[in-house]
């Protein structure tokens, strides 16, 4: 989770706050089940090439009994009737770690399908984490990845991390550090995550902790024998974090090339780094996950909302200093200096997704100088060791049978990790066949949606021309106000018809109000629902673009387009708005949709705080 260059902040489920304000629901934790009756979680895998988390073993057997690895060797003898799996020519790996995620909904189920058996969450709702732990302890979470979490992060009032709709405490003074950390541990945090980030990498300015506060929090975590990790996006804050004795960095910077002494400094302090190259790439305007959607080894298991998010990237602002080459260079230098590198994705930010994105992260780590085997280490034994999870991350007797079987040899081609044959969590096999069937069913439903009739009255494409003296729309549920009030914000908006529209027309829709600084991700604007009710999908696939006229007051404005297949996370287009009327056309293709399941169009103001007023006219789909 990092500040982005155009949408002000990367998201956990961030933009779903907007959908909540207009009545949309999001996916929630699905009830898990224990192992099916008769599933003993006992079997033997024979003749596999085994990467045991440290080295490769040729033609090796691995026996599993009641969810634990029993023996690793050759020609193992097992009890009569034991299930045997021939893995000749295949590679058996420890289940993978994703060492930087933000977890909610069905993320852990999704992760397991792609071979991730443990997620290290770096900020989520601690109540969600507690529910997962409860299920895990009861043996009811076998078909979802295991979870460790930082819970609530450490930030300042109005700092990064306060913008996601969760009411979280903030730190006001170094003197409060110990009590603050103790409160997080009482909530169940497994480690402490700190935000040291002022937005300067992308030309923004937000409040952040002081270096003294960062050092105090790190010391407080160490007093309780807990790791303290730090979110950074610039080399300046990365260096400051290490000097303050952070155990690790959960991002790498992109603003400048690494200084000659930076890697040595990190090594000297025995720190580790989770670079999150996938989201770093996405932050520069490149959809890091697009190649995953195109990969036939993965695509049958990727549902439509996930595919849509993987194809997204953060629009790049001119003032951004982010350069992906700097991130690669920093990882290369850190690795050469012997700094432990951990694979993490920052899912589910744009360009990423739970589970599947770890395979892109491994590929990028190899691009940054790790060998394929070293990349495998970064997702197995290294995070297990660093985070003290000594019951996993390797294939050895007595450890959890968290396993990933792939066709081919990932030690020579890291993309082989995508060619998944089977995944087990504590010996229970993940339901990949069921997941594939669900995706296929969804594709059929999408095809049916594309064949459904468009909304009545939409044939001409005209949404509103405001020539009748009202704010009415020609089809759909019409226009409504959307603000950040349901996310704890205090922004306001009003929509009304006013005379004198674009090109001398009779009228237009005026949107005015106030952007508050009560939450960091503030919004207020006008929302159009093309379906008969808010967020009801409408088939508008016969249209290819949105055309409209707009004028404003010099503030930044955005167009957000929502689709059902986009998982209710919108595509975002910055709008160059002046005080003069201007016609703008935005192609559906630029928004990552074909229009078959359009659920909403939002014209919105954002930061900085203050009053705003803009107008739109002659809005149409064409």
State where each predicted segment sits.
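Acidic, glycine-enriched loop/beta-strand segments at the rims
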Residues: 33-37, 50-61, 74, 353-356, ...
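Histidine-rich, glycine-flanked metal-binding segment
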Residues: 35-41, 54-93
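Active-site mouth loops of central-metabolism enzymes
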Residues: 95-103, 162-179
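Divalent metal-dependent hydrolysis catalytic cores, especially in the metallo-beta-lactamase
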Residues: 108-131, 144-152, 189-199, 227, ...
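Alpha-helix-loop-beta-strand connector modules within alpha/beta enzyme cores
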Residues: 141-145, 150-152, 207-230, 275
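Active-site neighborhoods of metal-dependent hydrolases
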Residues: 179-204, 253-368, 438-443
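Beta-rich carbohydrate-recognition modules and glycan-binding surfaces
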Residues: 451-622
């Amino acid at each position: 989770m990092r500040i982005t260059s155009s949408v002000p902040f990367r998201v956990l489920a961030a933009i779903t706050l907007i959908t909540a304000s207009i009545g949309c629901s999001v996916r929630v934790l699905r009830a898990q089940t224990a192992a099916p009756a008769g599933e003993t979680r006992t079997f033997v895998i024979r003749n596999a090439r085994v990467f045991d988390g440290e080295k490769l073993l040729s033609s090796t057997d691995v026996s599993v009994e009641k969810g634990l690895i029993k023996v690793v060797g050759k020609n193992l003898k097992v009890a009569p009737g034991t299930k045997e799996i021939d893995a000749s020519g295949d590679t058996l790996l420890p289940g993978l770690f994703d060492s930087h995620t933000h977890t909610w909904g069905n993320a852990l189920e999704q992760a397991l399908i792609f071979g991730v058996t443990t997620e290290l969450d770096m900020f989520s709702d601690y109540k969600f984490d507690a529910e997962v732990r409860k299920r895990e302890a009861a043996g009811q979470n076998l078909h979802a990845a295991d979870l460790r979490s930082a819970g609530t992060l450490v930030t300042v009032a109005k700092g990064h991390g306060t913008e996601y709709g969760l009411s979280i405490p903030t730190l006001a003074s170094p003197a409060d550090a110990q009590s603050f950390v103790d409160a997080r541990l009482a909530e169940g945090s497994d480690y402490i995550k700190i935000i040291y980030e002022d937005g300067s990498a992308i030309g923004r300015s937000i409040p952040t902790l002081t270096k003294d506060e960062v050092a105090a929090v790190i010391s407080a975590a160490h007093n309780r024998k807990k790791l303290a990790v730090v979110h950074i996006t610039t080399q300046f804050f990365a260096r400051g974090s290490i000097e303050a004795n952070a155990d690790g960095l959960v991002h790498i910077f992109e603003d400048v090339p690494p200084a000659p002494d930076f890697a040595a400094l990190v090594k000297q302090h025995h720190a580790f780094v989770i670079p999150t190259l996938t989201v770093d790439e996405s932050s520069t305007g490149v959809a890091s996950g697009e190649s995953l959607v195109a990969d036939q080894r993965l695509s049958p298991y990727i549902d439509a909302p996930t595919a849509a998010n993987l194809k997204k990237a953060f629009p790049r602002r001119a003032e951004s200093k982010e350069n992906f080459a700097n991130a690669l260079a920093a990882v290369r230098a850190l690795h050469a200096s012997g700094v432990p590198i951990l694979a993490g994705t920052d899912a589910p930010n744009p360009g990423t997704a739970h589970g599947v994105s770890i395979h892109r992260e491994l590929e990028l780590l190899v691009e940054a100088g790790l060998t394929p085997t070293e990349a495998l280490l970064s997702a197995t034994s290294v995070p297990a060791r660093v985070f003290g999870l000594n019951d996993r991350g390797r294939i050895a007797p007595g450890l959890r049978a968290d396993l990933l079987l792939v066709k081919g040899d990932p030690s020579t081609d890291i993309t082989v990790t995508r060619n998944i044959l089977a995944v087990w969590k504590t010996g229970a096999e993940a339901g990949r066949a069921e997941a594939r069937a669900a995706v296929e069913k969804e594709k059929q439903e999408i095809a049916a949606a594309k064949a459904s009739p468009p909304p009545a009255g939409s044939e001409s494409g005209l949404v509103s021309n405001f020539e009748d003296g009202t704010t009415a729309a020609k089809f759909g549920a019409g226009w409504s106000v959307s603000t950040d009030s349901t996310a704890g914000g205090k922004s306001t908006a009003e929509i009304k018809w006013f005379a004198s529209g674009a090109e001398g027309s009779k009228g237009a829709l005026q949107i005015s109000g106030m952007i508050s600084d009560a939450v960091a991700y503030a919004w207020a604007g006008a929302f159009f629902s093309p379906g008969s009710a808010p967020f009801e999908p409408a088939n508008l696939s016969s249209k290819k673009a949105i055309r409209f006229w707009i004028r404003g007051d010099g503030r930044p404005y955005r167009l957000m387009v929502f689709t059902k297949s986009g998982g209710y996370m919108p595509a975002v287009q910055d709008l160059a708005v002046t005080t003069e009327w201007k016609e703008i056309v935005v192609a559906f293709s630029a928004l990552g949709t074909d229009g078959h399941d359009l659920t909403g169009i939002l014209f919105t103001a954002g930061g900085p705080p203050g009053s705003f007023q803009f107008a739109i006219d002659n809005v149409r789909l064409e």
